[in-house]
């Protein structure tokens, strides 16, 4: 799994990470408290590591290699009663490709080149607009009109 944070969550690096994920079959997530994530139609979609400890542990339970790009090893907040502090399983190897202060786009470009996936097409979000509705004005019909 690729775990992204910081400037790795901008459009360009996120697209490169998407190429790596598609080309290798790896999954990817973002750190929980990301300051900024570029999202929307035409961009690579990424989900965050969940905040609740049990959900985060469930997401990470089968991860054997966690590659950090612009973030640190995921941990639970301090001293949560009867919950693990480390969210990764004991047999998970954590690899730091690039730390938060490193050149994240260059690190991802290098990895994509090494893996031979520079030209692999990433999965991009498609634009989804609601259908126009007719009839009485309701909160749903107004929302649909605004969303269209």
Regions found by a protein language model. Give the residues of each.
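A polyampholytic, Gly/Pro-enriched intrinsically disordered region
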Residues: 2, 48-56, 113-124
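Flexible, glycine/proline-enriched loop segments at strand-loop-helix junctions
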Residues: 3-6, 95-99, 129-134
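Glycine-rich, anion-gripping cofactor-binding loops and their flanking helix/strand elements
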Residues: 6-97
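Generic recognition of stable, solvent-exposed alpha-helical segments in well-folded globular domains
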Residues: 12-16, 55-58, 103-106, 110, ...
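Gly-rich Lys/Arg/Thr-decorated short loops/hinges at beta-loop-alpha junctions or inter-strand turns
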Residues: 39, 88-91, 115-130
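Ser/Thr/Gly-rich flexible loops in soluble cytosolic domains mediating phosphotransfer, phosphorylation
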Residues: 93-114
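Active-site diphosphate/adenylate-binding microenvironment
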Residues: 123-148
């Amino acid at each position: 799994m690729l775990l992204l944070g910081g400037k790795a969550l901008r459009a360009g690096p996120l697209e490169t990470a998407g190429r790596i994920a598609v080309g290798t079959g790896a999954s990817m997530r973002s750190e929980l408290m990301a300051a900024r994530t570029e999202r929307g139609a035409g961009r690579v979609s990424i989900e965050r590591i969940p905040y609740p400890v049990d959900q985060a542990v469930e997401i990470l339970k089968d991860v054997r290699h966690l590659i950090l790009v612009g973030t640190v090893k995921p941990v639970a907040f301090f001293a949560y009663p009867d919950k693990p502090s480390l969210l990764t399983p004991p047999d998970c190897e954590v690899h730091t490709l690039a730390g938060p202060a490193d050149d994240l786009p260059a690190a991802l470009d290098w990895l994509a080149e090494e893996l031979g996936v520079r030209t692999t097409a990433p999965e991009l979000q498609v634009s989804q607009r609601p259908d126009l509705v007719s009839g009485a004005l309701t909160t749903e019909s107004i929302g649909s009109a605004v969303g269209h």
